[in-house]
């Protein structure tokens, strides 16, 4: 009888593990565009540091802002097993900055994807209102191979000058999320919003989605601020990079990463990592 009981118990263990939820690490990172004028902080001097950070923190999905095409190729080559979706904001192909979504292709399948412009004509490269530059939002619908769960990741970079443009962009993204993600599925919205938490466009977003810092099960780790300006002595008080989620995403951990080498950060922004479970 004891042998039978033990055998049954062992048989049930694999089933329990197979059905257990798997967490995933999602990182948003403004990697700073490849600007030779940055001198010692130029991309060739920090490229390997960015790649090391993504690997050390075991990113399953990471989103980038400001990435030029050569940087996209560096990331694709350096992160083996990762694919991406995204286009350059200036021509819908390879010109201009990307707001791309990278994903581990050994863990996820790409189901759908697209890019829209934060403008009055979102289907074509364009800018509107008081925006200084073309701005985009790239999205992907992914399926986890093991669990067959599907979810959406949206990634964006709001204008750095246009006050009206930032408000209109927030409203447009919420509208587009409603149109694209009509299924009751998990949603993660990431990006550099060029907004601090108390500003109205972010308040509009928080009416529909949850700020991952505020809903993290564990206490948030790291500084409040996410912009360092390549200043290693920065007080890190300016928070402009965010990950938002809907009710189908549980945020277990939130961490603003401060990895550095020889007194230098890999970018003028700090990456933000959340550990999540898809419900």
Predicted segments, located by residue:
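Hydrophobic h-region of N-terminal signal peptides that target proteins for export
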Residues: 9-18
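Acidic/histidine-rich helix-loop elements
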Residues: 28-48, 94, 118-132, 159, ...
């Amino acid at each position: 009888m004891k042998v039978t009981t033990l055998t049954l118990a062992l048989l049930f263990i694999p089933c329990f593990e197979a059905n257990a939820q798997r967490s995933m690490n999602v990182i948003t990172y403004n990697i700073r565009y490849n600007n030779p004028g940055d001198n010692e902080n130029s991309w060739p001097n920090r490229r390997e540091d960015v790649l090391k950070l993504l690997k050390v923190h075991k990113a399953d999905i990471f989103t980038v802002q400001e990435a030029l095409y050569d940087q996209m190729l560096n990331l694709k080559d350096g992160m083996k097993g990762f694919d991406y979706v995204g286009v350059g904001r200036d021509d819908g192909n390879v010109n201009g900055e990307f707001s791309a979504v990278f994903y581990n292709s050994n863990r996820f399948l790409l189901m759908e994807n697209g890019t829209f412009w934060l403008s009055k004509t979102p289907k074509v490269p364009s800018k509107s209102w008081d925006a200084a530059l073309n701005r985009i939002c790239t999205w992907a619908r992914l399926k986890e191979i093991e669990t067959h769960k599907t979810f959406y990741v949206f990634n964006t970079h709001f204008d750095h000058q246009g006050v009206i443009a930032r408000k209109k962009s927030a409203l447009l993204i919420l509208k587009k999320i409603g149109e694209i993600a009509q299924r009751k599925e998990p949603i993660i919205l990431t990006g550099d919003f060029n907004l601090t938490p108390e500003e109205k466009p972010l308040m509009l977003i928080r009416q529909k989605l949850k700020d991952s810092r505020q809903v993290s099960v564990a206490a948030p780790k790291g500084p409040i601020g996410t912009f360092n300006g390549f200043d290693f002595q920065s007080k890190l008080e300016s928070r402009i990079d965010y990950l938002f989620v809907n009710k189908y995403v549980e945020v277990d951990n939130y961490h603003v990463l401060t990895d550095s080498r020889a007194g230098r950060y890999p970018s003028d922004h700090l990456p933000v990592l959340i550990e999540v479970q898809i419900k």
